A protein has these predicted regions:
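Aromatic sugar-binding interfaces of carbohydrate-active proteins
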Residues: 2-15, 27-34, 40-171
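Short surface loop/edge beta-strand patches of beta-sandwich-type extracellular domains
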Residues: 21-25
């Protein structure tokens, strides 16, 4: 089954942190950065989904790390009903235990202008209703590109250097 909306976590929308990522902000989107996604479990049960970033050799914790992306967080989100119906964090943890294939893609959104991701109308970011359309992007950047590199997987905290303070709460 497909869960189109899933359970999302956007620092701008869900953590009231509009100054977290963007040009010149805490995660400066004009420079390369690494995205770390962790799936801590306790006794084999997924407890949360943790996101952090590494930029210029510095580990940057997610905005307002006291807000935990756990089942309670997901259940409170409008549009995440199917996520819970399909098993929520328990179902996600079970699926991770069975094994998954990583798939990366680029979304060239000619109909929605990526409003779900960073649009002001959706409350997800500062972008206006038209600047996310591919034709508008190509006016600014003639040949936009993205690079996926140095993809790693392993035990939590083993794929990057730096502090892993977020994990202390799951080891209790």
């Amino acid at each position: 089954m497909c869960d189109k909306n899933g359970c999302g976590d956007n620092p701008y929308k869900h953590r009231s942190s509009p100054d977290y990522y963007g040009t010149g902000l805490k995660v400066d989107t004009t420079k390369p950065f690494t995205v770390i996604t962790q799936f801590p479990a306790k006794d084999g049960v997924l407890q949360a989904i943790v996101r952090k970033y590494v930029q210029d050799g510095v580990v940057i914790e997610n905005a307002r790390k006291e807000i935990i992306m756990d089942q309670e967080f997901c259940s409170a989100q409008a549009g995440a009903e199917m996520y819970s119906k399909l098993g929520g964090h328990k179902g996600m943890g079970d699926a991770l235990a069975r094994g998954m294939v990583l798939a990366l893609s680029i979304w060239w959104d000619e109909s929605g202008a990526m409003q779900w991701l960073d649009g002001s109308e959706s409350g997800s970011g500062p972008c206006n209703a038209t600047e996310g359309f591919p034709k508008a992007i190509q006016q600014i950047e003639k040949a936009p590109t993205v690079t996926f590199s140095q993809i790693k997987w392993g035990e939590i905290g083993s794929t990057f250097a730096g502090s892993n303070s977020t994990m202390r709460r799951w080891n209790a």
